[in-house]
């Protein structure tokens, strides 16, 4: 197991580069509140990176800045060497909350991004069907979101993100609302899709075991004002199966990351002894 200092080593051509990123906002009494400060991170092409940290440390804000949904106070984000100033089709965002359109069928939901992109109907629907098949929902393409389970809806969200063929997928706790068994099934489904698509993924989670199971690297945020406390390179061979979560090496990673964030978690929820 390798834990490295907060600032990552430079790579030749990172897919995502974050440099000196800072986010502040004005509190109720007009005081300046710093969410995070001096965040530096490189993410390589096809890499799966998970971010963990205590509640309120700015994980969601961080990936929204990478997507261009939220402006940084200072610092910069680069995708393929170009500075991010707004959302673009090279990035897709999968939200924690269900973001499917209830009046659209599953097929129409998956095809929506292609429609916005201006792809012709004759091209976008075969593409949407291909992705629906990839996530195992071919029998449900004419159904509406309310007719699907939570896990099935998140598969549709993933298919919709993949439909526009982004280079980067940003995922904000997409399995948080699912029960434990469904969450584990979705973790395996996500790895299966990622192994075939080889997209670059940044994935936010509060679940340490989920981060270790999915990631090539786990980035650990400190409590607010956040910095990158450490990065853990997960040296567990792929392909991974759920049974690996019971292995001594996996549990060693869980313990190491928990030791890094335990005090910050108690601080973030204001629990004192």
Give, region by region, the residue ranges found by the protein language model.
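The feature captures the beta-strand-to-loop junction immediately N-terminal to the Walker
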Residues: 52-54
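Helix-to-loop junction immediately C-terminal to a conserved catalytic motif
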Residues: 67
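Conserved ABC transporter NBD signature motif
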Residues: 75-87
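Short coil-to-helix segment of the ABC ATPase nucleotide-binding domain corresponding to the Q-loop/switch region
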Residues: 104-111
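Conserved ABC ATPase "signature" region
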Residues: 111, 115, 122-139, 192
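Conserved signature/switch motifs of ABC ATPase nucleotide-binding domains
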Residues: 143-146, 164
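Catalytic Walker B motif of ABC-type/P-loop ATPase nucleotide-binding domains
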Residues: 169-172
């Amino acid at each position: 197991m390798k834990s490295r200092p907060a600032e990552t080593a430079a790579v030749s051509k990172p897919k995502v580069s974050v440099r000196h990123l800072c986010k502040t906002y004005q509190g109720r009494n007009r005081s300046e509140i710093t969410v995070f400060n001096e965040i530096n991170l490189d993410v390589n092409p096809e890499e799966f990176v998970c971010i963990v940290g205590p509640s309120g440390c700015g994980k969601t804000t961080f990936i929204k800045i990478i997507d261009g949904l939220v402006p940084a106070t200072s610092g910069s984000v680069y995708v393929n060497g170009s500075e991010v100033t707004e959302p673009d089709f090279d990035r897709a965002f999968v939200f924690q909350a269900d973001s499917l359109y209830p009046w659209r069928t599953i097929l129409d939901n998956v095809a929506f991004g292609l429609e916005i992109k201006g792809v012709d109907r004759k091209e976008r629907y075969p593409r949407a069907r291909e992705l629906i098949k990839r996530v195992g929902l071919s029998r449900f393409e004419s159904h509406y979101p309310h007719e699907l389970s939570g896990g099935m809806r998140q598969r549709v969200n993933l298919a919709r993100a993949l439909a526009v063929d982004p280079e980067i997928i940003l995922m904000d706790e997409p399995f948080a609302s699912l029960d434990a068994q469904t969450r584990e099934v979705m973790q395996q489904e996500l790895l299966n899709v990622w192994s075939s698509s080889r997209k670059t993924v940044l994935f936010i989670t509060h679940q340490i075991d989920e981060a270790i199971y999915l990631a090539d690297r786990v980035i650990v945020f400190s409590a607010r004002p956040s910095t990158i406390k450490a990065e853990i390179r997960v040296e567990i061979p792929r392909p991974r199966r759920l049974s690996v979560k019971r292995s001594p090496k996996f549990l060693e990673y869980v313990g190491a990351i928990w030791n890094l964030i335990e005090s910050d978690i108690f601080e973030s929820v204001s629990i004192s002894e």
